[in-house]
Design a protein with these regions (language model features):
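Gly/Ser-rich catalytic/binding loops embedded in alpha/beta enzyme cores
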Residues: 17, 21, 33-213, 321, ...
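Short helix-loop capping/hinge segments that flank enzyme active sites or metal/cofactor-binding pockets
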Residues: 103-132, 290-300, 349-411, 423-427, ...
């Protein structure tokens, strides 16, 4: 591997336009687009803003191009839920809206797990879809974060697929079907922001909204060859809504985006960042890398003590070598807390908050529901797990204790190191169906615990974390470094 800065920038997709004759898109996606569409699909969001400012293209033309990309590319990957959004609303805003701000005129996708008044957001759940059919859209306003996105000039051009209630690391909801990885459509795009990731990776949009309560931005970014950042706890504007898991009390959920370039994510964070946060000085807009040389702690083992797949190990080891070639110091170490207890506690708190869904929607609908027809087996299994553990109160109390211990271990590590490097997932992108929500609960649980072993830590302790696209497997599948 050439560890030059040029190679690093190329692999990080910082170059916003492919070199002559080349493409940043998977081959099949580029082949589906007309020449002009394929060329535009190679720009990042800020690159498109520059074209708009130079009047080389209009926002309406961009929206129409996105509609064309959805028509040509989406049937293969099922990233965009065309039934949930009226594209004429996007065309109207592009045509008549006063578009100002750092993302003026850029079409984006919203994850099907947010508060948005102009589309049917059902969280990939048959239960919520039935509620909407009976009661209508519960949202009369956007969340503060979505409002900030629109004030920045972004044009919502569609809704991206997500697993039921955002509860899995793959996007295969029974309600809408599986989202497929643009690099190999037999494989998962990840979850829970899998539709957003696939839409960006396939060149449908340059940027898409995502949420992350256990890895849901970073895992799809890892699997789809994108940049994905989970911000520091409380850093971004809130998005509490009726479909929320209720995890705000533990502050483990964050929101941001999936992007093809680091600079797009930096600009997005600047747009949605809270400007007056106690103990958190503003980040502002980061225009380039720091000159500071870092001490990096490299950790290999999952929470259950397992080593990564050989391709994943190679990906992270090459990232470590790249960091060293750029002047940083990398040491192998261990995290220093009880990994199995942490993972079991994290799973328990997910289960406890999921249990609240059923009662909440029964109350909203005004009657009991037939559970097996309304919720997926994985969701039902989590509800039963929570009941067996006593519900929300004991699970929350345990989480506070265990997460505090994990925070102390991370804080101790940061007294010596500036950053932590690890895999995102223990394995490369697996095939569709391997983590299907319709599998037997214990089978899926075993697979999940075996392969998800790094990302939840940073949700629990509140540290920022990202997946950077620096490696492709011998089979042509992306593997990010964390």
């Amino acid at each position: 591997m050439d560890h030059s800065r040029r190679d690093f920038l190329k692999k990080s997709a910082v170059f916003t336009l492919a070199t002559a004759g080349g493409s940043l898109l998977p081959e099949y996606a580029a082949a589906q687009l007309k020449p002009k569409l394929s060329e535009l699909a190679n720009y990042d969001a800020l690159g498109l803003v520059e074209l708009i400012r130079k009047k080389q293209i209009s926002p309406l033309e961009l929206v129409d191009d996105v509609i064309g990309r959805v028509e040509r590319v989406n049937p293969r990957i099922n990233a965009v839920l065309t039934k949930l959004f009226d594209v004429e609303k996007a065309r109207e805003r592009a045509k008549n809206g006063v578009l100002e701000g750092p993302f003026a005129g850029v079409p984006v996708m919203l994850k099907n797990l947010t508060q948005y008044k102009d589309a049917r957001i059902d969280a990939g759940s048959r239960l919520y879809a039935r509620y909407i059919e009976k009661k209508g859209n519960p949202f009369r306003t956007n969340s503060p974060l979505i409002d900030a996105m629109e004030r920045s000039g972004m044009i919502v051009a569609g809704i991206a697929n997500a697993p039921e209630l955002g509860l899995l690391d793959t996007t295969e909801p029974v309600l809408y079907g599986a989202t497929r990885n643009p690099w190999n459509t037999d494989h998962t795009a990840g979850g829970s922001s899998g539709g957003s990731a696939a839409a960006v990776a396939a060149g449908i949009v340059p940027l898409a909204h995502g949420t992350d309560a256990g890895g849901s931005i970073r895992i799809p970014a890892c699997h789809c060859g994108l940049f994905g950042l989970k911000p520091t706890r409380e850093r971004e504007l809130g998005n509490t809504h009726a479909w929320s898991l209720g995890m705000e009390s533990l502050n483990i959920a964050s929101e941001l985006c999936l992007s093809r370039s680091v600079r797009d994510a930096a600009a997005f964070l600047n747009v949605v960042e809270k400007k007056n946060i106690e103990n958190l000085p503003p980040v502002g807009f980061i225009s380039g890398p720091s000159k500071k040389r870092l001490k990096v702690a490299l950790t290999w083992e999952t929470f259950l003590g397992k080593k990564p797949h050989p391709e994943v190990e190679k990906a992270v080891r090459e990232s470590a070598q790249l960091l060293e070639s750029l002047g940083h110091k990398v040491d192998e170490t261990k995290m220093g807390f009880d990994g199995p207890e942490f993972m079991d506690t994290f799973l328990g708190i997910f289960a406890a908050f999921t249990m609240q869904y059923e009662a909440r929607i029964e109350l909203l609908i005004g009657g009991e529901i037939k559970r097996e027809d309304a919720l997926e087996p994985w969701t039902l299994g989590l509800i039963e797990m929570a009941k067996s553990r006593g519900g929300i109160q004991p699970c929350s109390q345990r989480a506070i204790k265990v997460f505090t211990e994990a925070s102390a271990a991370v804080e101790k590590l940061f007294k010596t190191y500036d950053a932590i490097l690890s895999p995102v997932m223990r394995v490369p992108p697996y095939k569709i169906g391997w983590h299907s929500p319709t599998l037997d609960f214990n089978t899926l649980l075993t697979r999940l615990l075996d392969e998800l072993g790094y990302t939840p830590l940073h949700n629990a302790v509140g540290t920022p974390a990202m997946s950077a696209p620096l490696y492709w497997t011998s089979d042509g599948l992306p593997v990010g470094s964390h």
